[in-house]
């Protein structure tokens, strides 16, 4: 055959084969047999295609089938592939290389050897060189990258794993773990890289795939790898360190050729830095690490650069500095001349800056000298101390007394109930007075409601609360129109210092003997002390002598010598008076004189201040009246400085507030702690009409003094007040400074305590004068002191106090008497103040000398008495000098006395300590060293006990009050919450609850949050010391951490990095609000310098900018040069300071890996999906479900639904899609799917559930979670699902934060900081200063389940979802505007009379009657069935009557169930629906026997925005009012977002979780940021705003409301789970308790295992059924899972074929007897059907009247007592009917008909009494009965035999 014919035939064959391959079914096996078998027996087979796919199959076929035959026939076959074996196919063999001749022997001549490889370079002239240079490293033999390298790298890079983590023995399909999108991405990258890939490359192991692709691989990197390398270098290398620099560095340093360079850069792709490297040194260090790793992987040794010339080259050439200067001198001169030439041309003075600097230096030196002088004169402390701090922005206003009154009254009510207040003591009286001072009509209604509804029958404490509460109400009514008063009822106290046997010195305040109350105190003060007459009169004598001396001295006619003699005599008399009085043994009692401890002095004619009895009497009368009746300061305005905690000033502020004054108090240490102190002070003492304003203020600053008074008096920018009182008590201590130690601090203290007090008074005078306020002078309480240098060592303190006394004279001599009045208070020894606290221990000793010391409250009472109206009136006539010194000035040598007393105490204590030590030593010697151990105290440290408790289940007897609910609700239509959890700023729901309730973590909470944040981990093994250890260890150090030490060790860090705080960049991709990045378009006006880029990037620049960019290929490089030309537009990043820099963030260190989520999932999904996964698993575990597949034991896979939703979805994914993709950053290819809101639901199902039930994905902005609950409840009640996962989630992001700010919706952190707010305070719902919501992030999830299923499974029930609804609002143009659509939940038409249907008892009666009717209908149907069977038999003799009977019985039974459910809906679950006279909320509560008054808590959406709280409070108050909530029954308002911030989609879920925790605990958490409630909200009197947690005696129901942007409103009402248990019988309840206990143990173990092994989330690898079972499981509604031997839940191989209800049952057998009996004339038949739910076994009267003791014992012992009683009751009724006798009415007892069990267990009838007589009369010889009952009904047939 000619060659051309062969060629033509081959071509035809090829075409035919290709056509056959593409157009026909694949029959390659047969085709191979034709080709390989005779007669063809092809020996050379060539595959034309991209990879050897068919060739590989042919090789395997040859080996399996033809290998032996070919060997026998000597056939040598060849299988080739076009893409791999082109050289063999075309016979392109290389020529053989001729053998090289053997190397000649080495020459022995001296002729130098000539190298042929390259000519020697000519020697160059040496040039100046650095001290040391490096030569390039020795070249490494080059080797191009292999296809496997490229393949391996691309796969690892896409999987975001290191090269070691990707096994080359695995296929792409195995590596991606079923992620089809990721697989497609990799295949696309390979296609882009290699051009062509084999068929199905994803199924071939990487090493095999690499080998296949190697044949066609040319050793050069393709587009994909080149692009990745260029992108990595441009995005991660420092500026200027481009592609060429990278390659040059690696080549020079390690001698790498082009091929190995590519390999190293490939490896670098799998080691890419997380962020751009900061410097070239960092970049080189990173490249070094890559190169070393490459060398280790490839088994090569990298050489390092060597010093040039090596060790034999000698020293490197070095040039000296002088020579270098000479060489460069001419160049420097030339450049300088050119610079000066250019300057002259531009008319610029090059020396202008230096000249200006000289002038500035003169000025600077002058100012510096002045500043140095000022600092030298005043000192550093003074200089820093006078800095102003006043800011009106930071003013805190507290005036919501109306709210705190209700809070205090309620707290007192529960304190009595819980036994914390058992007796009427001073504490309870003081609290009652405080409540009375705030009496108002709303408060009276509030208290009256609680007292009227206080169940006194519950115990003594309830009775006491009711009694005392009513007394308090009566007292409040009596003072409602009276002004508030300050009345101190505390016991006066005395100092007590004791020293115990061991030498411990103890000081305490004890009740003062004989002085029980303040009236006794005033009497004691009036009596004064009893000192000897001589001592008392000594001062008076001295004064009188001084006056005589002055008169004599004034005589002009007296000689000089006489005057001198008189002067000497005067001095001698004074000296004699100063001597101590001689002791007397005279038995006569000396005469004693007294003056009051507190008295008023009046200035005498000669200018001395003398005791004035009249004024003192007036003052003491005021004190006595104040002690009895109180003092009012209503409508008074006061300024108080120096009122820190523990000071007299703080006590004065308390008194002023209690008396109704408005007070400005200043503080020099403005902080949250300080403002919280004043806020709590106002909360306790603020009375009706009072107001407290706290401002930062430095009394040492003149600026602050003026600014403060301007603020107080300015009507527009300030308060617009007119002060009535000024109490300038600010001071700082100067201890330890004698006259030679007067320093900067002393001068500053003098400025505070004297100079600026005068300035402050002057400023007040100026303000009053400028406003014409001369008829209302302000009383100034001057803080005087008896210390006129007496103590010493106190700097200028005495001088400051003495200086104030000049105001007594200035009042007369200056012009401000009409504006200010002066009252000097000489303050005595006051125990416990900041200045006097160190002297407390000697107070008792001081008092023994007849002096009186005072407590802070006593001294404050003294001063407040000076501020009464009577004393104020006295001050307007003349300055008042009030001596409140307690006789201290009459005590000589006070300092020495104090020192002596202190020394005696300390010596006594020291002696006793020594004696105790000696005694202990003797005892230990005598009895052994351990003998005292039994007497020593040992502190027992609590250990953490992480319980994760389920709701507590009460004894069944405790639910007796709910017995009316029995059988009244269809539990199949009741949704309950069985588990919940969250991921939020405070960790999970348990740790958040700790903070919400108590403001701190419990020990258990602290351990758990420390684990969550990765601070501790569990360890079990050998510790660092080599000893076995099991427990917590520090994650960083590995050191053991005892759980009791966790709180002390980590709490500070935890609090700093949890909750609402300044944004932490590491949580948000490095986002820093201080440098919020934006882009601005800029057009360049000159050509830029060129830079390097890859070829692709260069052409992309060209495509975008056209002629405005030049690109050129760089010779000998793969890089291109790019230059942007003039006119190019660029987007240049810029930054601004963004003012929203605070947010609620998940705890720092929260790591999904710690919960067990695999790395590939973490890298794949959006962070919000991780939050939802963790929340879902925790919620399931909280439900007692440790394996979600267990659910399929009870339900079909189609009955588990998911309604989790979000407001926005995956924010990180959206950011990647839009921002990162646009900026050409690496982004995963399937990022789109992670941005979908339903993707989180998909991951829940794929990783955890494998459910096939309904899914709804709500998107309701901030109301998403409530919308989710609404959807879940719809699915449960409609029967579409029996279990639902509901919840919501959302993230915090830079983009969302910026846009919320643009809307003006969020809190401006910058402004809040200016106002002195900490990040934790910036969310303040319901307060008068709220100003925008605080964004947050996280997720919340609930497990909502059908109640019947929950009981059956034994899962815990946390609450009943009694009501849920969503609503839109009205027409408008504002999407975020708050609306009132959810008011429709209270819609109803009022009726004139109460509706009986709402009453549970009424509905119970109707339902009982309906059940009787259903039973009668069933009886008739069963009786008619026999007639029906006879008729059917006649019509169709071949009919299977037995099968027909079974089916008809089942139909009847199902119809009975259906009718009962219909009845339950009619009178139970849904009785209120579609009734316009019953509001949905009223009806939903009435189902459970509740009313609107039983709604205890309202959890508010409470976003901390102005509009929301006004609207939401209005909505709730309107709902409650419209539904008839009682006056005074204010609902507790819970505002959770003060703690968590606003997580948008997850907010409602967190609130619902909190509401469920409230139901479980009865504890209502307060809004701790509610420092002052908005006055506007006072109108909503049915809402209370607690700021502190309140432990109640139980909450029955709670409301949760949510308002979302976009017209979404929602409301959920959850009800206490006890009401579910009231529906079921005792046996069912006890069985449920047992199941729940078992589940708790499993959940407890699971949770602790998760903490130990970090495996909370245990992702599923497969569904619970096999691939073959999938369709069968979907299509069989009865398919249920079971537990395998391996402990997993799977579906059995054989699924149930028919329903259990279709099987023959007892009812069928029971009714079969009807056929025989109806045809027997000697038998009477009785049939009775009873619904199990109709039999009330809780009705003891019914049970006792109708059942014998034997029957009761039998039924109560049955597994289902109610069903057993129903069976016995139906049997009795059937027996009665079979007797055919007349009855005594429906109420007649049936006890005479007894049903007993025979030995075989069959029921037997025993007749007693009248029943036996009636049977005998009717001729009945015996009665037999058959009973059948299930969970729904009981059927009995009785036969009376005659």
From Swiss-Prot:
Q: Which Pfam families match?
A: ACPS, adh_short, Fas_alpha_ACP, FAS_I_H, ketoacyl-synt, Ketoacyl-synt_C
Binding of Mg(2+) occurs at 1728-1730, 1828-1829
> Residues in domain Carrier?
145-220
- Asked if the Swiss-Prot or TrEMBL record annotates the protein with the keyword Cell inner membrane, the reply is no
**Location of the Ketosynthase family 3 (KS3) domain:** 1079-1616
| PROSITE patterns tied to this protein | CARRIER (PS50075), KS3_1 (PS00606), KS3_2 (PS52004), PHOSPHOPANTETHEINE (PS00012)
What GO molecular function annotations does the UniProt record carry, in alphabetical order?
Answer: 3-oxoacyl-[acyl-carrier-protein] reductase (NADPH) activity; 3-oxoacyl-[acyl-carrier-protein] synthase activity; fatty acid synthase activity; fatty-acyl-CoA synthase activity; holo-[acyl-carrier-protein] synthase activity; magnesium ion binding
Annotated active site residues, numbered on this chain, are 1262, 1501, 1542
Name the reaction it catalyses. Answer: acetyl-CoA + n malonyl-CoA + 2n NADPH + 4n H(+) = a long-chain-acyl-CoA + n CoA + n CO2 + 2n NADP(+); a fatty acyl-[ACP] + malonyl-[ACP] + H(+) = a 3-oxoacyl-[ACP] + holo-[ACP] + CO2; a (3R)-hydroxyacyl-[ACP] + NADP(+) = a 3-oxoacyl-[ACP] + NADPH + H(+)
Residues that the record marks as modified (Phosphoserine) are: 604, 1412
Record PANTHER family: FATTY ACID SYNTHASE SUBUNIT BETA, MALONYL COA-ACYL CARRIER PROTEIN TRANSACYLASE
To which protein family does this belong?
A: Belongs to the thiolase-like superfamily. Fungal fatty acid synthetase subunit alpha family.
- UniProt protein name: Fatty acid synthase subunit alpha
